[in-house]
């Protein structure tokens, strides 16, 4: 019996999938996994944060000397880091506040700041006297 156990994998949202690898036990007579197995693993479809099963795919034996036992595992997609940095603003005492704006970095997969931040806006600490807020 040839035992194949998929390795657990992780990736950050928006990054490329890691190689899906596995461990093999039960080889006999100097056989190697590369000479006994063909094909590769695949995973459940999805790119959002979550857990996706790693499946046997088309991994198969090319030797009649073994039976294959496969144990799957998971690919976990974790959240990406999104950086939001407020732009520095100034105003003259007594004038209206300027528009508060920000810069965003770390967006992935074609996401936009408006969609990810749900149209969020900035606010400032209350105060009108001369100073830093």
Task: Give, region by region, the residue ranges found by the protein language model.
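Solvent-exposed beta-strand/loop surfaces, strongest in extracytoplasmic domains of secreted
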Residues: 1-133
């Amino acid at each position: 019996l040839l035992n194949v156990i998929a390795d657990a994998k992780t990736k950050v949202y928006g990054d490329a999938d890691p190689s899906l690898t596995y461990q093999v036990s039960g080889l006999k007579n100097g056989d190697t996994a590369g000479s006994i197995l063909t094909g590769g693993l695949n995973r459940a479809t999805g790119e959002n944060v979550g857990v996706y099963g790693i499946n046997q795919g088309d991994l198969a034996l090319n030797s009649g000397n073994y039976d294959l036992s496969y144990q799957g595992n998971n690919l976990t997609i974790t959240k990406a880091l999104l950086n939001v940095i407020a732009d520095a603003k100034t105003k003259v005492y007594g004038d209206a506040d300027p528009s508060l704006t920000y810069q965003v970095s770390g967006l992935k997969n074609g996401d936009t700041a408006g969609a990810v931040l749900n149209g969020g806006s900035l606010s400032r600490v209350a105060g009108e006297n001369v100073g830093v807020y």
